[in-house]
Amino acid sequence: MIGQNLTLIFNESIDIAKEMHHNILTTEHLFLATLNNTQGISILQKCGGNIQEMRQMTNLYLKKYIPYSQEVSKSPKQTPALDRIIESMVSHAQNSNRQSIDVGDLLASIME
């Protein structure tokens, strides 16, 4: 049900959280991983997005607002906001009778 690109983005978002020593996994981690994905970049550029600026702003946000942990979590805990985005993404796909979820669905759910 989840497309390959989306799986890669989820895995990279977990890696980003670990690298930044964050014990929680947020929407911003997921968005930052999307900014490193070719399909995500393509969609955002077609909408007029400045990828470099969005990366910088998202990194700044994560460093400023997400607490640094001395220990690296093996599995950062998803925030309730991230849970809602995932639920919304799945719900939209089910309601439109689609069998798979892709990067576009993720971005639509984040912007919702």
What is the predicted function of each stretch?
Residues 1-112:
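Histone-fold recognition with a strong bias for associated Lys/Arg-rich disordered tails
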